[in-house]
């Protein structure tokens, strides 16, 4: 029987790089004989339906008054929505996705059972959207003590972090069995 591997990555970002790295990661594990599932964990701030409003809130230029906000929505929303839908269709067609999870702490029952849990690949460990790091990408949700925790080509996205942040990363990385 094939070993099961569950991969968490930032697969729902609306760009080709995100989609292609997820697909490549899935396929490499499949070729090595694993039954691969991509954990369909999509944070609220990475859901394409929410991008226009989230970017608007952060914009000093467009968030001045009702009229500028309306113009921004009229111009940006169709692009975000149409591109988001197109990428969603590709993800659903080519990726073996788990059930959708938007809050990993509240929806643990949706996390697939696996022999191996994997973070990667690409920039999954750094801050997301200016926020703090997301512990889910360090596999903090894995309850199965027998399961291996691995990182496959995972990165932070930048190299300059405060000493406090480096200590936090160091503690989180100790939970892994293997890091490539």
Task: Show the residue positions of the predicted features.
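Aromatic- and Gly/Pro-rich donor/ligand-binding loops
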Residues: 8-16, 20-21, 25-171
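A short beta-strand/loop micro-motif in the catalytic core of glycosyltransferases
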Residues: 177-180
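Extreme N-terminal starter segment of soluble prokaryotic enzymes
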Residues: 2-6
């Amino acid at each position: 029987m094939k070993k099961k591997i569950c991969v968490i990555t930032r697969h729902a970002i609306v760009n080709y790089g995100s989609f292609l790295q997820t697909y490549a990661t899935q396929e490499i594990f499949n070729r090595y004989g694993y039954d691969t599932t991509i954990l369909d964990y999509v944070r609220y701030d990475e859901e394409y339906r929410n991008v226009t409003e989230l970017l608007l809130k952060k914009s000093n230029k467009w968030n001045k008054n009702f009229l500028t906000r309306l113009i921004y929505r009229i111009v940006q929303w169709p692009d975000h929505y149409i591109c988001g839908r197109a990428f969603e269709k590709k993800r659903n067609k080519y990726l073996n996705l788990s059930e959708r999870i938007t809050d990993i702490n509240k929806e643990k029952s949706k996390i697939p059972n696996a022999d191996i849990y994997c973070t990667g690949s690409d920039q999954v460990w750094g801050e997301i959207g200016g926020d703090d790091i997301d512990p889910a990408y360090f596999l903090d949700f894995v309850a199965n003590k027998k399961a291996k925790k691995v990182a496959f080509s995972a990165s932070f996205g930048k190299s300059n972090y405060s000493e406090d942040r480096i200590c936090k990363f160091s503690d989180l990385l100790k939970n892994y069995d293997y890091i490539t």
